[in-house]
Amino acid sequence: MLAIGITGSYASGKTFMLDYLTEKGYKTFCADRCIKELYQDVVLQTQILKLLPELESFNIRKISNLIYNNDLAREKLQNFIYPLLIDKLILFKKENANSKFGFAEIPLLYEAKFEKYFDFVVTIYCSEAIRMQRAITRSSFDIEIYNKIKEIQLSQESKIAKADFAINSGVDMLDLEKQIAKLIKDLECRV
């Protein structure tokens, strides 16, 4: 199986692309969904509360506010959660070893140094104006967190430069689907 990582800036279209690939029958993995599932574990919640005593209770919103405003807390949580995420990613790859492709959406792929787990990386991108427009429509949108995320992430340009492939999601649906189809064709040549 070729393992393909999908990354990009906040609200760049990563989840849309992953959902599209899932709909087309490809094997997919979403880091954000995986972490949300991990957070359902009461034992893990207790461990995080011990790790981050600033939190009075396990609350995703409070965790977000803390980690985007406290570098040490973010580093502690990442050092705790990333190995668990890597285990789940490795399991996904093993379970789908007979598939031609496996696509994994990892928002902080480069920042977390996860590129070593992939044969190829795709960066999905669009303009800042489009990202902001998409972000505002989310029920969880918080302008301060949006700006903090932008601060800690590599720039979109850096992600594009590091990637094997880049997809512009700031286009109409037909053009986006054509770009994804071209990506699949390019990957087919590398199997």
Curated annotation (Swiss-Prot):
It holds the Pfam family CoaE. The keyword Nucleotide-binding applies. GO terms for biological process: coenzyme A biosynthetic process. Pathway: Cofactor biosynthesis; coenzyme A biosynthesis; CoA from (R)-pantothenate: step 5/5. Its main location: cytoplasm. PROSITE patterns: DPCK. It is found in: Cytoplasm. It is an enzyme of class 2 (transferase). Its EC number is 2.7.1.24. It catalyses: 3'-dephospho-CoA + ATP = ADP + CoA + H(+). Keywords: ATP-binding, Coenzyme A biosynthesis, Cytoplasm, Kinase, Nucleotide-binding, Transferase. One of its GO terms (cellular component) is cytoplasm. InterPro entries: Depp_CoAkinase, P-loop_NTPase. Residues 3-191 form the DPCK domain. One of its GO terms (molecular function) is ATP binding. Coiled coil: none annotated. Belongs to the CoaE family. Catalyzes the phosphorylation of the 3'-hydroxyl group of dephosphocoenzyme A to form coenzyme A. This is Dephospho-CoA kinase. It comes from Rickettsia conorii (strain ATCC VR-613 / Malish 7).
